[in-house]
């Protein structure tokens, strides 16, 4: 939506402030490129943050495995494991 409004509003601004047709074309082209690059930067920032999350999984694999354990299902067996290990 932002890009559509820019394309509708920018020619009006360009025609009111430009000296010639070539200046109008150049100004519209520059503004359109600027909008496109801003949109691409926003999208790349979102993609970079999600890529970091996926790449973080390797160093923390053991930690994530511990987090995935269903502690409510495992908790009843903890006293048995402690007794067994303590008998050595």
From Swiss-Prot:
Primary subcellular site in the record, as a coarse category: secreted
Keywords tagged on the record: Amidation, Antibiotic, Antimicrobial, Immunity, Innate immunity, Membrane, Secreted, Signal, Target cell membrane, Target membrane
Organism domain of life: Eukaryota
Location of Valine amide modifications: 85
Protein localization: Secreted; Target cell membrane
Single GO cellular component term: extracellular region
Keyword Membrane attributed: yes
Propeptide: 19-57
Tissue-wise expression: Expressed in entodermal epithelium along the body column.
Signal peptide: 1-18
Family stated for the protein in its record: Belongs to the arminin family.
Known role: Antimicrobial peptide with a broad-spectrum antimicrobial activity. Shows very strong bactericidal activity against B.megaterium (MBC=0.1 uM), E.coli (MBC=0.2 uM), S.aureus (MBC=0.4 uM), methicillin-resistant S.aureus (MRSA) (MBC=0.4-0.8 uM), vancomycin-resistant enterococci (VRE) (E.faecalis (MBC=1.6 uM), and E.faecium (MBC=0.4-0.8 uM)), and extended-spectrum beta-lactamase (ESBL)-producing enterobacteriaceae strains (K.pneumoniae (MBC=0.4-0.8 uM), E.coli (MBC=0.2-0.4 uM)).
Protein name: Arminin 1a
Source organism: Hydra vulgaris
């Amino acid at each position: 939506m932002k890009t559509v409004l820019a394309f509708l509003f920018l020619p009006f601004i360009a025609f009111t402030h430009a000296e010639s047709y070539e200046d109008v074309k150049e100004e519209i082209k520059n503004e359109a490129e600027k909008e496109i690059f801003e949109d691409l930067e926003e999208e790349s920032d979102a993609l970079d943050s999600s890529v970091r999350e996926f790449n973080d999984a390797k160093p923390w694999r053991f930690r994530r495995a511990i987090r995935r354990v269903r502690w409510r299902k495992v908790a009843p067996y903890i006293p048995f494991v402690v007794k067994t290990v303590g008998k050595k």
